[in-house]
Structures are given as C-alpha cells and as structure tokens.
From Swiss-Prot:
Residues holding Zn(2+) 2: D99, E134, H348
Main EC class the enzyme belongs to: hydrolase
InterPro entries found in the cross-reference section: ArgE/DapE_CS, Bact_exopeptidase_dim_dom, DapE_proteobac, Peptidase_M20, Peptidase_M20_dimer, Peptidase_M20A
Top-level taxon: Bacteria
Cofactor info, note text: Binds 2 Zn(2+) or Co(2+) ions per subunit.
Protein name: Succinyl-diaminopimelate desuccinylase
GO term, biological process aspect, one: L-arginine biosynthetic process
EC nos: 3.5.1.18
Known catalytic reactions: N-succinyl-(2S,6S)-2,6-diaminopimelate + H2O = (2S,6S)-2,6-diaminopimelate + succinate
Function: Catalyzes the hydrolysis of N-succinyl-L,L-diaminopimelic acid (SDAP), forming succinate and LL-2,6-diaminopimelate (DAP), an intermediate involved in the bacterial biosynthesis of lysine and meso-diaminopimelic acid, an essential component of bacterial cell walls.
Gene of this entry: dapE
Oligomeric and partner information: Homodimer.
Length: 375
C-alpha cells in the first residue's frame, strides 16, 4: 500500500540538496501547498532559498524546517547510494531521511489532510522553509524572520521539525534551547629564542593561570528547564612548529552553551574581568550564534504533548538539551516554539535512516496539533 508521506520523503531525498543548494525541493513543496490554497512568498537571500507560505487568517501556527542536508561522506560506505532512497526492514535510508526531509513530508501531508477536513479553519496555518540550516545559516531562517518582523508579521506558535526523538517518535520534545557564545581570544607576547627567555614574553606561560581559572568557573547551576552552563575550549594554537622559538601569540577558542540564568553580556564581562586580573595583553572577538529560549507549558506545548500521547501512548520528556536550531531565530518573534521530529540516532551519519512507520505517525501528530490550534 502506498503512503503519501513516504512517497514525498523519497522524492525529496532524490534531490541532492547539499546546503545551501535547495536542488528543487522547495518547488516540490510549494506546488503541493499552492494546490490546497496556500499563498507562497519566496524570500531568497544570496545563495539561499527560503519561502513563507500561509493559508487563512488570525492566530498563526507555523511549521518550520530546512530542505538542505549535510554531505553524505563516502558514498561507497552506504548500503545504497545516499540520494537513492530505499526501504529495508521498515527503515527508509537516504541522506536527509531523518534530518529533516521526513519531517517536511509529514508536515505537508498533514496540512493536506487538515485542509481537506477543515477547509474553513479559523486560524492561520503557515510554513517557513529554508535551504540553509546545516551550513552558515546566515541567509536562511534568520533573514526571513528579520523580514517578517520588519512588517509586523504575526506568529503565535511554531513547530520545528528537527529530529528531537531518541528511541521512539515523540519520546522527546524540545521546548527550548541553550544559547551559544564563542570567544576567539588572542593573547599577545613577544617572540624570541628559547635560549633567551629574558628577551621574549611567552604568551602560553602568561595565559596558563588565566585558562586554569577559566575552566574552573561554575557559571551557574542551571534551573528547572536547563542544565548548568557549559564552557569548553575547542581550539588552541601557538608556536611556529620549531622547538627553539618562543611563540609571539597564543590563540584560544572557547564556546559557552548557556542557560537562561545568564546573558551573553554577563559571560563577556566575567571573561574580560578575568583577563584584566591576569594582566594579559589580548584581542578578543565574540560570536553570539543564539540566545537561549524557552517555551513553558502553554497552548503549543499542551497540543504537542496531547498529540504524542494520543498516537504513541507515551508522555514526552520536555528537554532543552542538544545544539542550536533555527528555533532560536523564530523565538525572537515572540512565538511559542517547540521541536518535534523523528528519531535522531543516525543524523549526519553514514546510512542515515528513519522508521517509515514513524513518519506516518508523525504526520498524524502534526495534523492533530493543527486541529487543536487553528481548526
């Protein structure tokens, strides 16, 4: 028996949409949405394709996602070519099956079924889709959100189809994400010969006490919704490669994944105070890739929990763990934001796959969420 969710997922996988190349995925989605009465606005920026689609008016529920995928790696290591979808033992294999073409297909099919049953729905149903989530994300959802905010576009609820589940679909729902702040720090010294240290100033030696103190800081203890803030050193570089040269500079890159207990400005102030305490000469560059956000219990979370309980007979965990997602941009619009998608065990891996039955279940969950919020 054919399944429209599986068929659409396979059509999307066949389009090798390596970020930010959409490879025709959005045209396929747009065609399906326009056929059921959606108005579609393309919002392309530079090399990235985005679209905003809506049907109806009033309180707005948007489904958000991305058509782009990460590179497949060594195609010879796949059980089947990564862009030729295949089903084995109930599992659908292909790059993007779980992240997140399966979710996109489930969203669109859910919308088709919802509109067929509720042609005069009272709220507004919308889609916000990008082709740049996996790469730089500079011209994707963030730019589309800026354009929507500039004209005071309404967005009350947003469901992001990222693969949130761990073992079975719906066992985990993400109702927030930690913030992410990266520090690119250069400590300046004076290069010289290792035999004449009095004529040089070793930045590695200078920075060692600072780094020791930095890694020992307990930034916070988290809260009911977030784990404690984490700081990790990601890269350290110094020296010329020669064993007789004292380096002139030390580069250190470290990243904070921070909770709502802190702001990026609080973190910056503490790091800068520590640098001054240790009397270091430095230059610093900060990159804030996302503020923390949280959607507490409310209409959207309740609708999502209800849908999962109805179709999978489990109570989902509400978590804020993991990396960042495009939900961080959408939250700026004041919307309640939740992530619900398939099992994430194989995302970005060789032989990425998803349980085909899970995608059918996901489409039913999405439809029930629509029925609770905008019918």
């Amino acid at each position: 028996m054919s399944c429209p969710v599986i068929e659409l997922t396979q059509q999307l996988i066949r389009r090798p949409s390596l970020s930010p190349d959409d490879a025709g995925c959005q045209a396929l989605l747009i065609e399906r949405l326009q056929a059921i009465g959606f108005t579609v606005e393309r919002m392309d920026f530079a090399d990235t394709q985005n679209f905003w689609a809506w049907r109806g008016q009033g309180e707005t529920l948007a489904f958000a996602g991305h058509t782009d995928v990460v590179p497949p790696g060594d195609a010879d290591r796949w059980i089947n070519p990564p862009f030729e979808p295949t089903i084995r033992d109930g599992m659908l294999f292909g790059r993007g099956a779980a992240d997140m073409k399966g979710s996109l297909a489930a969203m669109v099919v859910a919308a088709e079924r919802f509109v067929a049953q509720h042609p005069n729905h009272t709220g507004r149903l919308a889609f916000l889709i990008t082709s740049d989530e996996e790469a730089s994300a500079h011209n994707g959802t963030v730019k589309a959100v800026e354009a929507l905010m500039a004209r005071n576009e309404r967005l009350d609820y947003c469901l992001v189809g990222e693969p949130s589940s761990i073992e079975v679909v719906g066992d985990v729902v993400k109702n927030g994400r930690r913030g992410s702040l990266t520090c690119n720090l250069t400590i300046h010294g004076v290069q010289g010969h290792v035999a004449y240290p009095h004529l040089a100033d070793n930045p590695v030696h200078r920075a060692a006490p600072f780094l020791n103190e930095l890694v020992a800081i307990e930034w916070d203890q988290g809260n009911e919704f977030f784990p404690a803030t984490s700081m990790q050193i990601a890269n350290i570089q110094a020296g010329t490669g020669s064993n007789n040269v004292i380096p002139g500079e030390l580069f250190v890159q470290f990243n904070f994944r921070f909770s709502t207990e802190l702001t990026d400005e609080m973190i910056k102030a503490q790091v800068l105070a520590l640098l001054e305490k240790h009397q270091l000469r430095y230059t610093v560059d900060w990159w804030l890739s996302g503020q923390p956000f949280l959607t507490a219990r409310g209409k959207l979370v309740d609708a999502v929990v209800n849908a999962v309980e109805h179709y999978n007979e489990i109570k989902p965990q509400l978590l804020t763990t993991g990396g960042t997602s495009d939900g961080r941009f959408i939250a700026r619009m004041g919307a309640q934001v939740v992530e619900l998608g398939p099992v994430n065990a194989t995302i970005h891996k060789i032989n990425e796959c998803v349980n085909a039955a899970d995608l059918q279940l996901l489409a039913r969950m999405y439809q029930r969420i629509m029925e609770q919020l905008v019918a």
